[in-house]
Amino acid sequence: MKIIVKLFGLLCIAGGIALFSSPMIATENIKQETKQYITQFKQKEEKNKVNKEDDPRYLEIEEYNEKIYENHQKDFRDVNSYQSSPISLKGFKDGKFGYIKIPKMNVKLPLYVGASDSHLASGAAILGQTSIPVGEIDTNSVIAGHRGYQGAPFFREIEKLDKGDTITIVNPWDTLEYEVTGIDVISPFNTDAVMIQEGRDMITLVTCHPYRSGGKYRYIVYCTRKGTKPSRKGNESYQLLKTSTQDINNEDNVRRGGALLLAFLFLSALAQEIKFFIQESRYKKRSKQL
């Protein structure tokens, strides 16, 4: 019975270590999944490579981008429309469009068309009724990401981004580099803040704010393609609102501290059991000799 109790205690400590370490495990998992996604994406596009001007997928995207610009994104009002894919994109399996790299956040994620729950659980997603990024003016691709999801970071560290930082979009035809030009915090219903800006080639990152707030506000990062006209948007007063940096740091410190403490307790208990086992073995050996 004593042995069972001790084993149960060790298992509880090991379970605690796994719990506190789960964010690191989740982060590593998403990195491996993204690596596999990118490899498959590159292999597929290399195999089917054609000039973009001759690619039906590209022509369909051009037509769509032009249409929503000309109609002033009139359907960009219904929350459900954000989740659905804006166009069929028959050549893109499961909405896969490429990937996004954000060096300042140490993030590389699959990029999907349509912000469905499944897409957002796997990477970043382009909101329906916003532009698809192919390097054209009069476009603004609004790209959403979770502020952390099941332990993986996704857009959790978005507040690390500053003006001038680079964000890269890799689509089937081009690698497009964008520069952060403005930051703001808005209401979830303020679609006007993320509309297309005439004469500009933009992407806008969006995630919940503050961290673990349940989506009270949206943290917005405006980015303009390098070498093109910068965004008119941005609001320096956003810094007066609550920042999540300290909350994120505190959470990380608690997780690391908890994992280290439990690891110490586990190793101490294990060392004690090993010591007891060795002493007991020696005692039995001496008893036999007598």
PLM regions: where:
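Solvent-exposed, non-transmembrane regions of membrane-associated and secreted proteins
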Residues: 2-250, 275-279
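C-terminal single-pass membrane-anchor helix
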Residues: 240-290
